[in-house]
């Protein structure tokens, strides 16, 4: 049984579909329950229908990950429905891509609530259930923006320099860098237990609904298929927990290292 947050669209939805194709029962979590209810295409109802149509079991859980009250009911609701929990994927995220000097306190608060507090609290709630199974997996979805930009003198032709300067990813990247450190800490503190904790990010941009809506990214840059993230997530959440833990990794290099090819979301 897996919980996947931010699963009404994009990377989260595709991870849920890939897990279901391998036989996992999935609880999918997001704010948008019905089609047309959110600002972007995609909803829990649509993803659940796709999973069920392929023979999978799915529980949609409508919740706002920025709300501590909503966060507190996600794990209990999934466990009550399925009777167990094996995997937690913390994918939901938020940011405002504005010049950092224009970012408001409310932007910082919401970004840290979604991108750091939610993974921390859900992991705390999930851990007793993972321990009860004797093995478990926690996967935090990070971002290449967590990488610190190099110092001056700045290379005007450097892709990452240009993205950070013009894409205003400082707030988002700061929360994801904190998430990477949190991941490494969870992993080492659980190193004597059979619970793997890893962070996974795409190499570059993924053309998800959210990324397209944000805009400002160059289609000539490396665009990674969402299937690569879904396949890499599967590898980090089904291999023996003591085999892969404490990794802060990018999807395509991980798959190359493990000598695993990218499959479709249906597992084919």
Name each model feature, range by range:
Residues 177, 192, 199-200, 216-268:
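C-terminal helical subdomain
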Residues 123-124, 184:
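A short, exposed helix-loop element centered on a Lys and neighboring polar residues
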Residues 42, 62-74, 105:
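The beta1-alpha1 cofactor-binding region of Rossmann-like NAD(H)/NADP(H)-dependent oxidoreductases
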Residues 137-192, 204-206:
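Catalytic loop of short-chain dehydrogenase/reductase
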Residues 22-46:
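Conserved glycine-rich Rossmann-like NAD(P)H-binding loop of the short-chain dehydrogenase/reductase
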Residues 99-100, 107-109:
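Substrate-binding pocket helix/loop in short-chain dehydrogenase/reductase
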Residues 8-9:
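Conserved glycine-rich cofactor-binding loop
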């Amino acid at each position: 049984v897996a919980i996947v947050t931010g699963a009404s669209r994009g990377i989260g939805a595709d991870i849920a579909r890939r897990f279901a194709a391998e036989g996992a029962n999935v609880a999918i979590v997001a704010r948008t329950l019905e089609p047309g209810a959110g600002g972007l295409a995609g909803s829990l109802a649509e993803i659940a229908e796709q999973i069920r149509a392929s023979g999978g079991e799915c529980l949609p859980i409508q919740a706002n990950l920025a709300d501590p009250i909503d966060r507190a009911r996600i794990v209990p609701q999934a466990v009550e429905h399925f009777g167990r929990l094996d995997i937690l994927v913390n994918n939901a995220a938020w940011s405002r891509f504005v010049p950092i000097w224009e970012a408001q306190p409310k932007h910082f608060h919401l970004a840290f609530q979604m991108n750091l507090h939610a993974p921390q609290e859900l992991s705390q709630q999930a851990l007793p259930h993972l321990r009860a199974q004797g093995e478990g997996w926690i996967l935090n979805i990070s971002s290449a923006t967590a990488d610190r930009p190099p110092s001056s003198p700045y290379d005007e032709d450097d892709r990452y320099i240009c993205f950070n300067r013009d894409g205003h990813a400082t707030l988002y990247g700061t929360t994801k860098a904190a998430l990477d450190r949190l991941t490494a800490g969870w992993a080492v503190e659980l190193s004597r237990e059979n619970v793997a904790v890893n962070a996974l990010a795409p190499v570059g941009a993924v053309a998800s609904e959210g990324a397209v809506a944000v805009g400002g990214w160059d289609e000539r840059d490396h665009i990674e298929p969402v299937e690569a993230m879904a396949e890499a997530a599967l590898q980090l959440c089904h291999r023996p927990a003591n085999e892969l833990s404490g990794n802060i990794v990018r999807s395509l290099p991980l798959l190359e290292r493990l000598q695993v090819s990218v499959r479709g979301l249906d597992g084919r």
